[in-house]
UniProtKB/Swiss-Prot annotation:
Belongs to the UPF0507 family. Residues 289-436 form the VPS9 domain. InterPro entries: Ankyrin_rpt-contain_sf, UPF0507/Ank_repeat_27, VPS9, VPS9_dom_sf. PROSITE patterns: VPS9. GO terms for molecular function: guanyl-nucleotide exchange factor activity; SNARE binding. Pfam families: VPS9. Transmembrane segments: none annotated. One of its GO terms (cellular component) is transport vesicle. The lineage of its organism: Eukaryota, Fungi, Dikarya, Ascomycota, Saccharomycotina. GO terms for biological process: early endosome to late endosome transport. This is UPF0507 protein C1Q_01007.
Length: 1090
C-alpha cells in the first residue's frame, strides 16, 4: 500500500502521536498498538518550548524527546467511565499511560501533576482543542481532546543556546518582585534574631521589664521625659553589649532603642498628648482655607502668565498629601512617623511618582518652581485638610525620640521635620496676631455662608448680595471644586449664570477650559455626571461661541482619573451628543478600554436607547469619514474582549451592515455575541443575528465547551436559535439541540420544518423515544446506508447526569449525527414531515409501522430460485457499484484529511507568526526588533465557518459511504461466493448421480420401494440406498441454493433501492449542500476581509 505523508504539524508532540505516516516502522509502534482502540487526552506544551528548549538532564532537545515513548507516556491521560462525570465538588483524577496521577480542576483550568512525577507542577490549561482523527491507526474515537498547557510536564528545561540573542528581552513574570533593599533586609533579620534571643532567655526579658517599669514610675504623667527614656535605653545597652549572646549584632543600640520604643510607645504618647493639651494646633478654624488665600503669588500673576491648570495640579497633590498625612495618627514609632512625613512632602512636591493620570498630563507641576515658602504654604493646607489633632506631639516625638539625633537635623528627614516645625510656627504666629485671626474668622464665616447658599439642601437658587462675596469667588474646596463647579453640582444654575456673566474677568473662558477637580473632571463632565443638563448646555454654548475648533476638541476630550472624557458619561443626553459629537474622539478609551460609543451602547437604562444608539453610531461614522477613514469596529473592543456586538442591547442591524465585522468574536470569557444575547434573552438581537449568513451557530466556549444552546433557558429563545440550526442543517429540514437530563432521562429539543401556522416547531423528545424510532426505521430498512446502529448504541450511553468537556463533545457529535441522519430520512421521505410535532406523534407512527411490518408476508415461505445468469448479473452490478463506492470512499478520505489539515496548518501558521513576532520584539538589536512590527500576513485562506460545515458534511458522507460499502461487500464477497460454492457442490452431486445412475431420469424419492429377489434384492438395496443418499444431498443442496439465492435476491433488490437513495442523497449533499455552500459562504466571508 502506498504511504501518504501529510504535512508536518508545528507542535512536535502532537505531530509525533497523531501524524505518523508509517506506524508499523515507528519507534512508537508499541505505543500506537497500546492506544489503538483506547480513548485518551493529550497534554501538549506550547510549541515555543518544544522547539526552542532542551532537557537539562539528558541534554536532548525537547522536540527529539517527543519521539521517546518514556517521555510521551506522561502526557497521555487514559479515559475511563469516570472521565465523563463532571465533579464540581471534587477534582477529576486521571492516570497517565505510565501510571502517574494527574488531577484536573476543570472549573479553574488547572492541572496538578502528583504521584509518580519527580517534579510536581501546577499547570495552566491555555486552550482546549478537539482534534478530528485523521490517521488510520487510532480507532478508539473519531475526535481526540488536546489540552494545551503552559509548560512541559516531567522535566527540567532550559532555552537553547541560540536564544541568547533574546536574553535582554526576556519576559518578566507577573509575580516578579523588585530586588529587596539588602541593608533594610539585613536589619530586619537582625531584629528578628534579637527578639528571638530575648524570648528564649526569660531572665533578659525580666530585666527589660524592670526598666520599662522604672520609666512608667519615674516619668511624670504630663512629661514624656526623653532623658529618662534615653537613660534606660543606654542602661540596657551597657548591660548587653558585653554579653556573648548579642556580640554579633552590628546595630545593637538601634535594636534596643526600637524594642524599648515598641513597648513604651503608648506611655510616651499618652504623656505627650497630656503635655500639649490645650496648646495643640486647632485646624477647625482654618477649615475653609483655600489655595487662592495661601498662594497669593500665583493669583497675582499677570493675565498672560496665570494658568489655572497649575492650580488644579496643586490641588491634586494637596489631596494626595492630605490623605497620606492622615496615616500619621496610625503610627507607633519614630520610623513610621518619619516615613509618613517624608512621603507626604514628596507627594506634595511631586518628587515621587503620582497616579498614572497625573504622570500623563503635559506641562505639569513638575515644571513649576517649588520654593520653600510655597512648600510651607501648601503644607499648611495639607495639615488643615488632613485634620491632624496632635501636630505638636508628632513634631516633638520626631525631634526627640530618634535613635540618631543627627537624622532630624540633616538630609531629607531633617528638611521634612524643619518644614513641619515651620508649619507649627506658622499657626502659632497666626494665632498670636489678633488681626489675622479676626480676618481668618471673617473669611471663614463668609465662605461658610456662601457654601451654605450653594448647598443642594438650600432651596434658593440665587444670591442677592453676590457682590459681597467677590473676594472669595476664587475659592476651591478640598475636592478641587471651584465656585462654578459647586454651582453645577448642586444645580444652582441661576447663580452660575450670574457669576459667569457678572464676573467674567474672574472667570475667563481660558479658566473655564482649565477648571478641573482633583479627579480631573472638567466643568462639562461635572455637569453631565450631576445630571445638570441646563448647565451643560450653557457651558457648551459658551465654548462654541468663544473657542476655536482645536480648543473645543482638546476640551471635550479631556480625561478624568478614569481616562473618561465627557462622552463616556453621555447616556440619554441626545441634544448634547448632537452638539458636541463632531468634536469627540470616538476612539479614545477609558481605563476599562471602553470608547464613548461602547459606553453609550451599554447604557441600558435610558428611555430612548435605540435612538441614542443610532444617533451616536451615525455621528461616530461621520467623525471617521471626517478623518479620512472608515468606521473600524475593532477600535471599540474593551479590556475584557467585549465588542460593540457583545454589549448592544437592541438594534444590532446598524452593526451587521458593516463589512469587516466578526460576528462570532469571543470575549475573554469565550462568549460570542449570540451567547450573550441568549444568556440575557435579547430576542430582537437573536432574531437579527441568526439571519446573518456569517454566524457560526455552534461556536464553542473554550473554557466550558458550552454553546449558545447551553445558555438558553427559555423556549422562545431555543426556538429562535433552533430555526437557524434547521436552515444550516444538511437539507434544512430538522435540527437536534439542547440535550437535557431529568432524573437520568435524557431529552433533546428538536426544531423541524412544520406544516402548521408557523414555519418551524420546537419540541422536547425523550432520547429513548428517538432510540426506539431508529430501531423501527432500521427494521424497515435493514440495508440503509445510514449508520443507525451506531447512533442507537451511542444513545444507550447517555445516562450521565453531569458531563465534563469530554462528555459534552460526545453529546455534540451525537446531536450533529442525528441531525444529519433525520435530515436524510426526511429528504428521502422515509418518515413523514410532521412526525416531530410532539412525542405522541412519534410513538403513534412507530405502533402503526410495527403493525404494517408484522402484516407483510415473510420471504422465507416462498424462496426464489436463482439461476447463474441472474447471479452473474447481480454480481456484475454490485462489483461495478462497489468499485465506484470504494473509489469515492477513498476520495472522501483524502478530502476529509485535507480539510482537517487546512484548519490545523492555519492554526500552526498563526502560532508560528505570533512566536516570530514575540521573539522579534525581544531582539537585542533595537533596529532589528522594530522590523518585526511591520510584518503583516493573512493566513485565513478559508473561513472558519465554511471549513467547519464542509468537514462535517464530508465526515457524515464518508460514514454513510462506508456503511453502504460494507453491505455491498458482504453480498459481493461473502454471500455470492457462498452461493457459487453451493452451486458447484450441487452440480457435482448431479454429476455423480448421473454417473452412478445413468438410466435414472431423476433421483428417486426415499419413499419409493419394490420387492426384489433375495440376492438381487441385497444388491439392489445397496444401490437404492446409495441413490437415496445422493438424492437427499441434492435436495438439501437445492434448498440451500434457493435460500441463498432468495437472500441474495432480496438483498440485491433492497441494495439497488438503497444505492438509488444513496446516489440521490450523495448528489444533493455533496454538490448543493457541501461544495456549492462551501464556495458561496467562503467567498462572501472572505470578501469582507479584503
Amino acid at each position: 500500500m502506498s504511504v501518504y505523508h501529510l504535512p508536518t504539524l508545528l507542535n512536535p508532540l502532537v505531530n509525533a502521536i497523531f501524524n505518523c505516516p508509517e506506524p508499523e516502522r515507528s519507534p512508537l509502534k508499541k505505543l500506537f498498538a497500546n492506544l489503538k482502540t483506547r480513548r485518551f487526552i493529550l497534554l501538549a506544551p506550547p510549541s515555543e518550548y518544544l522547539l526552542n528548549y532542551h532537557d537539562v538532564k539528558s541534554k536532548l532537545p525537547l522536540h527529539d524527546l517527543c519521539y521517546n515513548a518514556e517521555f510521551i507516556n506522561s502526557y497521555i491521560l487514559l479515559m475511563t467511565e469516570n472521565s465523563y462525570i463532571n465533579t464540581n465538588s471534587r477534582d477529576s483524577h486521571y492516570e497517565t499511560l505510565d501510571g502517574k496521577t494527574v488531577v484536573i480542576q476543570w472549573k479553574n483550568n488547572v492541572i496538578h501533576a502528583l504521584n509518580g512525577f519527580h517534579i510536581r507542577r501546577r499547570l495552566k490549561i491555555l486552550e482546549t482543542k478537539i482534534l478530528p482523527n485523521f490517521n488510520d491507526y487510532f480507532e478508539g474515537a473519531a475526535d481526540f481532546i488536546i489540552l494545551f498547557i503552559d509548560q512541559p510536564l516531567n522535566c527540567e528545561f532550559v532555552p537553547n543556546d541560540y536564544l541568547q540573542c533574546f536574553h535582554n528581552y526576556e519576559k518578566i513574570p507577573k509575580n516578579a518582585h523588585a530586588m529587596p533593599n539588602l541593608s533594610i533586609d539585613s536589619f530586619q533579620q537582625e531584629r528578628s534574631s534579637f527578639e528571638n534571643i530575648l524570648h528564649i532567655h526569660p531572665a533578659r526579658l525580666t530585666q527589660l521589664g524592670q526598666l520599662f517599669s522604672s520609666y512608667r514610675t519615674l516619668a511624670p504623667g504630663d512629661d514624656p521625659s526623653r532623658s529618662i527614656f534615653e537613660s534606660i535605653v543606654q542602661q540596657a545597652f551597657d548591660g548587653m553589649k558585653s554579653d556573648s549572646l548579642f556580640k554579633n549584632f552590628s546595630n545593637l543600640y538601634d535594636l534596643i532603642h526600637d524594642y524599648f520604643e515598641l513597648n513604651l510607645y503608648d506611655d510616651i504618647w499618652s504623656r505627650l498628648t497630656t503635655h500639649f493639651k490645650g496648646h495643640e494646633v486647632d485646624t477647625e478654624k482654618y477649615k475653609y482655607f483655600s489655595v487662592n488665600q495661601l498662594l497669593t503669588d500665583f493669583y497675582s500673576k499677570d493675565y498672560g502668565e496665570f494658568k489655572l491648570h497649575d492650580i488644579t495640579l496643586i490641588e491634586r497633590r494637596l489631596h494626595l498629601a492630605s490623605k497620606h498625612l492622615q496615616k500619621l495618627a496610625l503610627t507607633h514609632s519614630y520610623a513610621e512617623k518619619s516615613k509618613i512625613l517624608v512621603e507626604t512632602l514628596q507627594k506634595l512636591s511631586g518628587t515621587t511618582e503620582m497616579d498614572s493620570h497625573q504622570l500623563e498630563l503635559p506641562d505639569g507641576l513638575n515644571n513649576m518652581t517649588m520654593d520653600a515658602d510655597t512648600l510651607i504654604s501648601l503644607f499648611v493646607l495639607v495639615v488643615c485638610r488632613s485634620e491632624q489633632k496632635h501636630l505638636k506631639s508628632h513634631l516633638y516625638y520626631l525631634q526627640n525620640f530618634s535613635n540618631n539625633s543627627s537624622s532630624t537635623k540633616f538630609g531629607i528627614l531633617g528638611y521634612a521635620v524643619s518644614t513641619l516645625e515651620a508649619v507649627v510656627c506658622y499657626f502659632e504666629d497666626f494665632n498670636k496676631n489678633t488681626g489675622n485671626v479676626a480676618k481668618a474668622n471673617t473669611l471663614c464665616e463668609k465662605t461658610k455662608n456662601l457654601l451654605d447658599k450653594l448647598s443642594c439642601e438650600n432651596p434658593t437658587n440665587e444670591v442677592e448680595d453676590l457682590a459681597t462675596y467677590k473676594d472669595i469667588l476664587t475659592y476651591r474646596n478640598e475636592q478641587g471644586q471651584s465656585i462654578p463647579s459647586i454651582c453645577i453640582t448642586n444645580h444652582k444654575n441661576y447663580i452660575l449664570l450670574d457669576i459667569l456673566s457678572e464676573y467674567e474677568n474672574d472667570f475667563p473662558v481660558e479658566d473655564l477650559l482649565e477648571d478641573e477637580t482633583i479627579d480631573g473632571s472638567t466643568l462639562l463632565i461635572e455637569s453631565i455626571k450631576a445630571g445638570n443638563l441646563e448647565a451643560a448646555k450653557v457651558l457648551i454654548k459658551i465654548m462654541l461661541f468663544n473657542c476655536t475648533e482645536e480648543e473645543l476638541v482638546s476640551y471635550i476630550n479631556k480625561t478624568d482619573k478614569y481616562a473618561r472624557t465627557v462622552a463616556h458619561y453621555l447616556t440619554h443626553e441626545m441634544d448634547i451628543l448632537k452638539s458636541i459629537g463632531n468634536y469627540i474622539d470616538w476612539k479614545r478609551k477609558n481605563s476599562s478600554g471602553q470608547t464613548p460609543l461602547f459606553s453609550i451602547f451599554r447604557s441600558y437604562d435610558q428611555p430612548n436607547y435605540e435612538e441614542m444608539v443610532k444617533t451616536a453610531f451615525d455621528i461616530a461614522n461621520t467623525w471617521y469619514r471626517k478623518h479620512n477613514s472608515l468606521f473600524d469596529y475593532l477600535d471599540h473592543t474593551d479590556n475584557k474582549g467585549n465588542s460593540l456586538l457583545h454589549v448592544l442591547k437592541t438594534n444590532i442591524p446598524i452593526l451587521l451592515q458593516l463589512t469587516k465585522l466578526d460576528i462570532n468574536e469571543e470575549n475573554y470569557k469565550g462568549l460570542t455575541p449570540l451567547m450573550v444575547y441568549v444568556k440575557y434573552k435579547r430576542l430582537s438581537n437573536i432574531d437579527a443575528i441568526t439571519k446573518d449568513r456569517r454566524l457560526i451557530l455552534e461556536k464553542v466556549q473554550n473554557s466550558t465547551f458550552f454553546t449558545c444552546f447551553d445558555y438558553a433557558k427559555d423556549h422562545s429563545v431555543l426556538s429562535k436559535i433552533g430555526e437557524r440550526g434547521v436552515k444550516d442543517s444538511l437539507f434544512g429540514l430538522i435540527y437536534f439541540h439542547s440535550l437535557r437530563y431529568h432524573n437520568l432521562n435524557a431529552t433533546t429539543n428538536i426544531t423541524s420544518v412544520s406544516n402548521a401556522e408557523k414555519p418551524f416547531a420546537t419540541t422536547v423528545i425523550n432520547m429513548k423515544t428517538i432510540q426506539g424510532l431508529l430501531r423501527s426505521i432500521l427494521k424497515d430498512n435493514p440495508f440503509t446506508f445510514l449508520p443507525l446502529n451506531t447512533y442507537i448504541d451511542e444513545i444507550s450511553h447517555l445516562n450521565r447526569s453531569d458531563l465534563t468537556i469530554i462528555g459534552k463533545t460526545d453529546v455534540t457529535s451525537l446531536l450533529h449525527q442525528l441531525t444529519n441522519c433525520f435530515n436524510v430520512l426526511l429528504f428521502l421521505k422515509k418518515i413523514p414531515e410532521n412526525l416531530f410535532t410532539d412525542e405522541a406523534s412519534i410513538l403513534y407512527w412507530m405502533r402503526i409501522n410495527t403493525s404494517k411490518r408484522n402484516q407483510k408476508p415473510s420471504g422465507k415461505e416462498n424462496p426464489k430460485t436463482m439461476e447463474p445468469e441472474e447471479i452473474n448479473m447481480i454480481q456484475s452490478f454490485l462489483r461495478f457499484n462497489f468499485d465506484e463506492i470504494s473509489s469515492f470512499k477513498a476520495s472522501l478520505n483524502i478530502l476529509r484529511k485535507v480539510l482537517i489539515f487546512i484548519n490545523l496548518k492555519s492554526d500552526d501558521f498563526e502560532d508560528a507568526y505570533k512566536g516570530l513576532n514575540e521573539m522579534g520584539r525581544k531582539l537585542i538589536n533595537s533596529e532589528a526588533s522594530s522590523a518585526f512590527k511591520g510584518i503583516i500576513t493573512n493566513h485565513n485562506m478559508f473561513s472558519e465557518l465554511s471549513l467547519a460545515e464542509l468537514l462535517e458534511n464530508v465526515r457524515f458522507l464518508e460514514q454513510c459511504t462506508i456503511q453502504l460499502s460494507s453491505f455491498v461487500q458482504i453480498i459481493l464477497f461473502e454471500k455470492i461466493p457462498n452461493w457459487w460454492k453451493h452451486y458447484g457442490e450441487f452440480l457435482a452431486l448431479h454429476k455423480s448421480y448421473r454417473k452412478a445412475f445413468p438410466n435414472m431420469v431423476k433421483p428417486k424419492s426415499a419413499s419409493d420401494t419394490s420387492s426384489r429377489a433375495p440376492l438381487g434384492g441385497f444388491i439392489e438395496t445397496k444401490r437404492e440406498q446409495s441413490e437415496q443418499r445422493l438424492a437427499v444431498q441434492i435436495k438439501a443442496s437445492s434448498k440451500m441454493l434457493k435460500e441463498l439465492g432468495s437472500e441474495i435476491f432480496v438483498a440485491h433488490e433492497r441494495l439497488a433501492e438503497e444505492l438509488s437513495n444513496y446516489m440521490e442523497f450523495r448528489k444533493a449533499c455533496l454538490d448543493q449542500r457541501s461544495l456549492v455552500a462551501f464556495a458561496t459562504t467562503n467567498i462572501s466571508v472572505l470578501q469582507e476581509c479584503v
